[in-house]
């Protein structure tokens, strides 16, 4: 009979311990219930990107001197730079510049090491397409600046969301 009594005591201790764990979990759950939601409704609401966000690369054709530093510092040799040497002015003339964003890892080395600052990172991150060949941007597509999230009147940014009053 003694083992049966110790069994009931152990069962009682385990029940109390389980109730305490459930109570602690409930307290944590209730403390999280009055917080601001982390998720957003993506197509209709967008978060503001940080100042140093590494999005799509913007290219300024007029500033490029075809030095190919961007190709040399790229870990995957991604930018394609076509140029022609002009003998009369003894300089390279840029013919074509393209980047395939399906392969790009957005490391930012090309932007950082460009001597003429003709490359910059934008806040555009919506690059999804149905055809992977549409991700190959030439100098015309790279030169278009995206519409900033702040200026897009169809989008509610995180700053425009209603505030939850804390106690």
UniProtKB/Swiss-Prot annotation:
Cofactor requirement: [4Fe-4S] cluster
GO cellular component, one term: chloroplast thylakoid membrane
Textual note on the cofactor: Binds 2 [4Fe-4S] clusters per subunit.
Keywords: 4Fe-4S, Chloroplast, Iron, Iron-sulfur, Membrane, Metal-binding, NAD, NADP, Plastid, Plastoquinone, Quinone, Repeat, Thylakoid, Translocase
Designated gene of the protein: ndhI
The protein, known as: NAD(P)H-quinone oxidoreductase subunit I, chloroplastic
Gene3D superfamilies: 3.30.70.3270
Gene Ontology BP term (one): photosynthesis, light reaction
Any one GO molecular-function label of the UniProt entry: quinone binding
The keyword Disulfide bond is assigned to this record: no
Self-association state and partner proteins as the record states: NDH is composed of at least 16 different subunits, 5 of which are encoded in the nucleus.
Boundaries of every 4Fe-4S ferredoxin-type domain copy: 55-84, 95-124
Matches recorded under Pfam families: Fer4_7
Entry annotated with the keyword Repeat: yes
Catalytic activity: a plastoquinone + NADH + (n+1) H(+)(in) = a plastoquinol + NAD(+) + n H(+)(out); a plastoquinone + NADPH + (n+1) H(+)(in) = a plastoquinol + NADP(+) + n H(+)(out)
Compartments, record wording: Plastid, Chloroplast thylakoid membrane
Membrane topology listed for this record: Peripheral membrane protein
Highest taxon of the lineage: Eukaryota
Family to which this protein belongs: Belongs to the complex I 23 kDa subunit family.
Principal EC category: translocase
Stored InterPro entries: 4Fe4S_Fe-S-bd, 4Fe4S_Fe_S_CS, NADH_quinone_OxRdtase_chainI, NDHI
